């Protein structure tokens, strides 16, 4: 390669890439890096106050345009943020739609709970496909291609679902491409927000808050469409947001090409090599040390425990959100509209917890581990009340108010556990394992988010749906126990515990 192709260091430019071209992952690298910490605390007035910050660079015969990830000075970044916020509304609705429609699908298609639970497994397969194909998508099509593919998949298959397919297996198959699209959107949104130069934490909270808010309003909305007699038309709502998102994605990501992905990956390789000594021109195209494999990463105690924690956590969270509505209808009341509001209490609490408890953590706890430990015990206490209150059979208004409040508390305290655990994991892991370690843990956690709800469907079918709260309590108790013992297995990082 000639010297003109060697890119300069671009410390002031955020990294969008999910994995580097030489198999060295860099996704979410900037979330807790020291340089980003300095940027996040930088006074906003010191940032350049002009919009002409897009630079054009020659890279392997093509023009690559780079710019700082500052939405205040680069309008294009603001559009990218807006696109991700819109698509996270689709993400939230998608995650709760299956749970809200479970009773309707069982009745409409004359299938069992086990059959309808297969949707969780199919969506997991799509999400895993997204994890395995992210690097290849970015390498060949850039982030722009990945985002357009994701929004396009949502549009096409939401249209199919809106027609109320005559076969349940068509609905089940739609979960695969939807899971693929949502997986791409999830990764892109977190990478973008985590790489912003200003207000990254606030915008990350808003994005995940929109996810929770969308999941919160889904059960009541679905119930109204079911009562109306046209349940499938609910899919027109996420379809609308997907179309708007697609319209915004076109201009927002127009410069996020495959060439830019390759350029940024090469820059990252050069910066990694410079930790040893200043590399020569040809070093940009040399492969750095190969990343450890999946099972090798799991042998690291910090990664294994983090993975197990997410497996149990996502199993408890998604099982509660997906099966709670069906549990209410079959054990408490057949009033779908009224029960949908109680079912929404969990997602309401989760949204409140993720938006508000972050401020509590900063002001009242020494570190994220201690905050998460306290929230985990509060979650366990709330789920204990959930199990006990669920044993009572009553149709009084007071009873349902108490049940609403208890489940709201379950959502509130379980909400911040995922992001806090991720912060702790990144604190104790060496920097070179940040992305690969988190990637493995999220993949394992996603398996829990599909396997446990599926197990809940099997239990509901064989022994009764009344045992769903107990299953969730067991998951919460296990991840609380693991989090309590976590420091005993992680040596040399006492300052974080």
From Swiss-Prot:
Please list the residues that carry the modification Phosphoserine: 37, 41
What are the subcellular locations of this protein? Golgi apparatus, cis-Golgi network membrane
- Residue ranges annotated as Lumenal topological domain: 1-72, 166-167, 227-232, 322-340, 395-397, 461-462
Annotated keywords? Glycoprotein, Golgi apparatus, Membrane, Phosphoprotein, Transmembrane, Transmembrane helix, Transport
**UniProt main location, coarse:** Golgi
Residues linked to a glycan:
49
Instruction: State the InterPro entries in the record.
Output: MFS (IPR011701), MFS_dom (IPR020846), MFS_trans_sf (IPR036259), MFS_Transporter (IPR051788)
What Pfam families would the database entry show?
Answer: MFS_1
Topology relative to the membrane, per the entry?
Multi-pass membrane protein
CC terms in the record's Gene Ontology section: clathrin-coated vesicle; COPI-coated vesicle; Golgi apparatus; membrane
Q: What is a GO molecular function of this protein?
A: transmembrane transporter activity
Membrane spanning residue stretches: 73-93, 145-165, 168-188, 206-226, 233-253, 301-321, 341-361, 374-394, 398-418, 440-460, 463-483
Gene3D superfamilies, from UniProt?
MFS general substrate transporter like domains (1.20.1250.20)
Q: Which residues form the signal peptide?
A: none
The family annotation for this protein states: Belongs to the major facilitator superfamily.
Instruction: Relay the record's extra comment.
Output: Present with 414 molecules/cell in log phase SD medium.
Main function:
Probable transporter.
Q: What protein is this chain from?
A: Bypass of stop codon protein 6
Where does this protein come from, organism-wise? Saccharomyces cerevisiae (strain ATCC 204508 / S288c) (Baker's yeast)
Q: Which gene encodes it?
A: BSC6
């Amino acid at each position: 390669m000639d010297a003109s192709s060697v890119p300069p260091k671009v410390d002031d430019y955020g990294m969008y890439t999910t994995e580097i071209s030489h198999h060295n992952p860099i996704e979410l690298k900037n979330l807790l890096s020291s340089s980003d910490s300095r940027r996040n605390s930088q006074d906003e007035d010191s940032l350049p106050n002009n919009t002409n910050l897009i630079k054009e660079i020659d890279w392997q015969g093509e023009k690559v345009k780079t710019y700082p990830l500052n939405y205040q000075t680069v309008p294009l970044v603001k559009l990218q943020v807006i696109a991700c916020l819109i698509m996270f509304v689709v993400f939230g609705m998608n995650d709760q739609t299956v749970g809200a429609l479970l009773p309707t699908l069982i009745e409409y298609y004359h299938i069992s709970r086990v059959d309808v639970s297969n949707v969780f497994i199919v969506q997991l397969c799509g999400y895993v496909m997204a994890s395995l194909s992210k690097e290849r998508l970015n390498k060949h099509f850039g982030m722009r291609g990945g985002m357009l593919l994701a929004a396009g998949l949502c549009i096409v298959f939401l249209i199919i679902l809106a027609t109320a397919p005559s076969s349940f297996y068509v609905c089940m198959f739609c979960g695969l491409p939807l899971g693929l699209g949502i997986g791409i959107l999830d990764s892109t949104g977190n990478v973008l927000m985590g790489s912003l130069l200003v207000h990254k934490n606030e915008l990350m909270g808003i994005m995940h808050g929109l996810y929770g808010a969308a999941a919160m309003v889904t059960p009541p909305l679905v119930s109204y469409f079911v009562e109306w007699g046209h349940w499938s038309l609910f899919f027109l709502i996420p379809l609308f947001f997907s179309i708007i998102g697609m319209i915004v994605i076109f201009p927002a990501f127009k410069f996020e090409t495959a060439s830019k992905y390759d350029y940024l990956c090469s820059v990252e390789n050069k910066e990694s090599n410079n930790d040893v000594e200043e590399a020569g021109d040809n070093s940009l195209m040399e492969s750095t040390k190969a990343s450890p494999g999946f099972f090798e990463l799991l042998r690291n105690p910090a990664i294994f425990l983090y993975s197990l924690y997410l497996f149990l956590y996502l199993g408890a969270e998604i099982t509660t959100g997906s099966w709670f509505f069906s549990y209410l209808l079959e054990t408490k009341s057949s009033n779908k509209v009224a029960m949908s509001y109680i079912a929404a209490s969990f997602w309401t609490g989760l949204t409140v917890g993720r938006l508000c408890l972050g401020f509590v953590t900063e002001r009242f706890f020494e570190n994220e581990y201690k905050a998460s430990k306290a929230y985990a015990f509060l979650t366990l206490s709330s789920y204990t009340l959930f199990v006990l209150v669920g044993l009572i059979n009553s149709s009084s208004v007071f009873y349902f108010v108490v049940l609403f409040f208890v489940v709201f508390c379950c959502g509130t305290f379980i909400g911040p556990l995922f992001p806090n655990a991720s912060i702790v994991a990144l604190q104790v892991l060496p920097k070179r394992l940040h992305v690969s370690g988190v990637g493995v843990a999220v993949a394992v956690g996603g398996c829990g988010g599909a396997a446990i709800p599926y197990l809940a469907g099997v239990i509901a079918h064989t022994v009764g749906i009344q045992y769903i709260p107990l299953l969730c309590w067991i998951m919460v108790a296990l991840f609380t126990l693991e989090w309590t013992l976590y420091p005993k297995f992680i040596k040399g990082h006492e300052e974080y515990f």
